[in-house]
Amino acid sequence: MVIGELDGPVGYAIANLIGDQTKGHSRVFAILNCDVQVRPVTLMVSKVTVKSEKYTNILMGTVQAGIANGVLDAVRAGDIPKEKANDLGIIVSVWLDPSVTEIEVDHNILFETNRQATAKAIHKAMHNEPTIDWLLKNQANTTHYFHQLGIEKKL
């Protein structure tokens, strides 16, 4: 997640990303509904190559709505000052497991997961969390989840 002023590098990046679409990695704005874009302007960038209509509909439906609501939750919580909502832009890198097309999806859980994750990421970004002191103190005690699975030969 990147947050910054629309009249600076983040605004420039949003304009470039939305204007330079890449097949399978569409960049879309976070919206509450087809004609209701959230503030701050939030651009979603998929980390997974989109290959199916079902995946697209889940990403551009449930996930998009969850992210949009998470942004507004962050404004409501004061993590993003309401008076800055029209001046800031957010770029969200989105990962949705490609196997989502092969399982029965609980859209309420997927929505809430993305809503809460977005609000939490914004909170951390706006409060400079984790701090460099925390990172240095906890570096040796923090293991990346998938790295650990690899060590345990579970990948």
Predicted regions and their residues:
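Accessory interaction regions appended to the cores of large information-processing enzymes
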Residues: V2-L155
